[in-house]
Swiss-Prot record:
Protein's name in the database: Ig kappa chain V-VI region J539
GO process terms (BP): adaptive immune response; immune response
Keyword Nucleus: no
Organism of derivation: Mus musculus
Framework-4: annotated span: 97-106
Anything else known: This chain was isolated from a myeloma protein that bind galactan.
Taxon lineage: Eukaryota, Metazoa, Chordata, Craniata, Vertebrata
InterPro entries linked: Ig-like_dom, Ig-like_dom_sf, Ig-like_fold, Ig_sub, Ig_V-set, IgV_Light_Chain
Domain of life: Eukaryota
Start and end residues of each stretch annotated as Complementarity-determining-1: 24-33
Region called Complementarity-determining-3, residue ranges: 88-96
Region (Framework-2): 34-48
Length: 107
């Protein structure tokens, strides 16, 4: 089973700040996806196939990486970006998720 380790577990950012969340895989994966979850809702697909933004995701988000190291970046933090972000990979026959990164708005 491939284990995904996210860093940091929790972070806070001010409006306009650049935010980077990392996801490290215990062995190489061919693709990686990101989900966003807000309180009381189900996780939403956010970035798929490493760097492709899901429909409706603002262009301030980007994804990158390869092999065992991946990241999600928010170029300029907005209040609506406060959420939990999860990375996810699928290597037959198992889908695995990271434990999540909680991103809070620093006021």
């Amino acid at each position: 089973e491939i284990v995904l380790t996210q860093s940091p577990a929790i972070t806070a950012a001010s409006l306009g700040q650049k935010v980077t969340i990392t996801c490290s895989a215990s062995s190489s994966v061919s693709s990686l996806h990101w989900y966003q979850q807000k309180s009381g809702t189900s996780p939403k697909p956010w970035i798929y196939e490493i760097s492709k933004l899901a429909s409706g995701v603002p262009a301030r988000f980007s994804g990158s990486g390869s092999g065992t190291s991946y990241s999600l970046t928010i170029n300029t933090m907005e209040a609506e970006d406060a959420a939990i972000y999860y990375c996810q990979q699928w290597t037959y026959p198992l889908i695995t998720f990271g434990a999540g990164t909680k991103l809070e708005l620093k006021r």
